[in-house]
């Protein structure tokens, strides 16, 4: 059984419609059957099969037939899969336009952060990577490792010029979102006059 529901609490038998909420039992007027269940939840890292899967083990006991020697106890595993096609959303990231006053025409070390929200995964189930394209020439000079959380934060030295940072986040269902941030570092140090010793003018 596959559902497009992300909250495990909404998959409780009391919240499901027949025939998914409990076993369908048939018996005689003298039967006294009762059903109980136990869940085991499994996450999938790539989301190809499902966001997560619940193996719900139903146990049915007939008190009229219950005997440790002869039976009266039956079990069945119900497989519940959760799929989701909605990718996480990255909050808008402002482009940066910064000034460097370094006398040697150096750049700046800046702090970066991207934040995402998702309707199907908690913060710990979001995975991030980011890529740095120096000079914005479609070539990535740096690719980060993977990190998890509701946000990704890092500090990085950025040289003078126009650059691009690409953030990618995905959740346990395998859907991903990409957001770009443009970064411009300008040389804002004004020119300074220098005296040349031994030079005179009339």
Q: What residue spans do the PLM features occupy?
A:
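Proline-threonine-serine-rich low-complexity tracts
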Residues: 1-202
């Amino acid at each position: 059984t596959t559902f497009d529901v992300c909250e495990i609490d909404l998959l409780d038998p009391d919240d499901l419609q027949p025939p998914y909420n409990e076993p369908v039992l048939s018996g005689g007027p003298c039967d006294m059957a009762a059903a109980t269940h136990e869940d085991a939840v499994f996450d999938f890292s790539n989301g190809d099969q499902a966001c997560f899967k619940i193996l719900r083990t139903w146990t049915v006991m007939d008190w009229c037939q219950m005997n440790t020697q002869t039976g009266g106890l039956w079990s069945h595993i119900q497989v519940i899969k959760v799929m989701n096609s909605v990718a996480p959303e990255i909050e808008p990231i402002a482009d940066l336009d910064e000034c460097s006053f370094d006398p040697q025409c150096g750049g700046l070390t800046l702090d970066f952060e991207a934040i995402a929200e998702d309707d199907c995964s908690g913060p710990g189930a979001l995975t991030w990577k980011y890529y740095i394209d120096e000079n914005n020439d479609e070539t990535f000079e740096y690719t980060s490792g993977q990190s998890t959380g509701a946000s990704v934060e890092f500090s990085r030295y950025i040289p003078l010029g126009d650059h691009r940072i690409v953030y990618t986040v995905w959740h346990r269902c395998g859907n991903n979102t990409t957001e770009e941030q443009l970064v411009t570092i300008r040389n804002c140090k004004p020119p300074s006059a220098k005296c040349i010793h031994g030079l005179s003018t009339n």
